[in-house]
Amino acid sequence: MYIRYYKSNKRVLMKTIGISPHRRSFLRKAVTAGPAVALVAAAGVGVAASSNTQPAYRPAYFTAAEWATLQALVDRLIPANSDGPGALEAGVHEFIDLQMNTPYAYGKLWFMQAPFVPESPPEFGYQFHMAPRDLYRSALAGLEHAVQAKLGKAFTTLDAAQKDAVIGELEQGTLAIGAVPPKTFFGQLLQNTREGYFSDPVHGGNKDMAAWKMINFPGARADYMDWVEQYGKHYPLPPASIA
């Protein structure tokens, strides 16, 4: 599902258009008509330095091959365009890697005993026997094997259209990638990509708060009382991180 968006009275409005895995605009589903962003940030995540001073990031969890595939995937979910930075510029891949060493990724935040029903509504919580970090490890290897078998190439070497087609097959559940159902992997990847793009920069993504600037989200300021009764006025201050 992807979203076409437009602004009216300084609010982001959304209209469902159709199915397309290669449009970055469907990430706007993570943003409501107001400046609220839904996040599932895990406790204990490492703090990332400012993108202006940070040295080249080295993944703490993913192998070199997994890291390259993950970057290629998130780059196609949110490619850079005139609206704002892409996933790579925003550090989404770094956010996901940092998450892999938190209680969240180990499955410590929810009930992890059978039975699991992957088709359950989101309200029923996480529904897979692998913790997120194990899911990624299995799915990324399975994806690489499936693409090699089908196209004779590594996923990272495919052109943009081919990558989008593969991601579309994951979304539709038609590309077998081993032990992890393709739809389950796509849903996990999409959710973490949204979180990394729109989360507070303290968690490693949303570099320079670029995603917040794109949607005019004010961030984590402690006090808005000076603006409560200034109806219809543009809020002029830049977004603020919790750090």
Question: What is each of the regions a protein language model found here?
Answer:
Residues 56-58, 74-186:
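Flexible, low-complexity segments enriched for small/polar residues
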Residues 33, 76, 196:
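Short alpha-helical functional segments enriched in proximate histidine and acidic residues
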Residues 19-25, 40-76:
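C-terminal segment of N-terminal export signals and the immediately downstream linker at the start
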Residues 30-38:
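Sec-dependent signal peptide hydrophobic core
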